[in-house]
């Protein structure tokens, strides 16, 4: 039996990167997966590739900052697959500016995607997750994408760090609220280090600017070396952690922070 046999998942920001890798591993583990994103062409392509590989997947357009988009996306998922067991709040953006450079518009965009998106997703999916959780021995699951800088500070991206810290706190609060209300919904966060993908490239470029380093190849090597394990993370590294948190193997975990950062925060 596969780890997620019979489960139905929704993954936001899943047209590429960690989200797409998560959708792929979830399908491989037996789940039916709806993917939501703003990037319609890439999103349809990702869903199509999952179906061509023998999985069940559907793409829905989603702007995570809009409550009506969330309502339509979750409704479409439930209508298409018959329910919802897993929500992965993956969509996020990066801002590499210090406080003095940042504008109110920067903050509003960052907060809209990284915080409002997680809140709206959780709120909208809650009725479907409550229903499926009540019928499952280990309950349903929410996994929120935070960051290693949601646990420690960041000199190069303080407002990004603030939003990721907010996700960490929100995760713990929702775990406690749902437990108090006897909802069978587990809520956990995952905290990546620097990942070798598009957003990771933005983080490496920001570190290079902060250090006055113009050689991006050297900056990449320095970022790799900054992780005690000696390399950057991959999207698959994080996707494996998400699949674990979504599965019954994590049935005794709620309000937890799964750190997958190559040892960065151990220093």
Predicted regions and their residues:
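Active-site helix of classical SDR
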Residues: 122, 163, 171
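Substrate-binding pocket helix/loop in short-chain dehydrogenase/reductase
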Residues: 98-99, 103-111, 223
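Short C-terminal tail/terminal secondary-structure segment
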Residues: 3, 152, 231, 241-244, ...
């Amino acid at each position: 039996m596969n780890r997620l046999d019979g489960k139905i998942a929704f993954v936001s920001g899943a047209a590429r990167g960690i989200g797409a890798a998560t959708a792929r591993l979830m399908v491989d583990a037996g789940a039916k997966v709806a993917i939501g994103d703003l990037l319609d062409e890439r999103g349809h392509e990702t869903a199509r590739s999952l179906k061509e590989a023998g999985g069940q997947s559907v793409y829905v357009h989603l702007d995570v900052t809009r409550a009506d988009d969330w309502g339509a996306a979750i409704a479409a998922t439930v209508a298409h697959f018959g329910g919802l067991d897993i929500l992965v709040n993956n969509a996020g953006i990066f801002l590499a500016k210090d406080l003095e450079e940042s504008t109110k518009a920067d903050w509003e965009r960052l907060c809209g995607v990284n915080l409002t998106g997680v809140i709206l997703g959780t709120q909208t999916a809650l009725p479907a997750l409550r229903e499926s959780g009540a019928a499952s021995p280990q309950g349903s699951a929410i996994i929120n994408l935070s960051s290693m800088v949601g646990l420690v500070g960041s000199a190069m991206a303080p407002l990004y760090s603030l939003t990721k810290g907010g996700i960490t706190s929100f995760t713990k609060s929702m775990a406690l609220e749902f437990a108090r209300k006897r909802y069978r919904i587990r809520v956990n966060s995952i905290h990546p280090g620097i990942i070798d993908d598009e957003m990771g490239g933005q983080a490496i470029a920001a570190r290079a600017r902060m250090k006055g380093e113009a050689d991006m190849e050297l900056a990449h090597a320095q970022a790799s070396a900054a992780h005690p394990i000696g390399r950057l993370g991959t999207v698959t590294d994080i996707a494996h952690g998400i699949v674990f948190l979504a599965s019954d193997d994590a049935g005794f975990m709620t309000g937890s922070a799964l750190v997958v950062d190559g040892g960065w925060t151990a220093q």
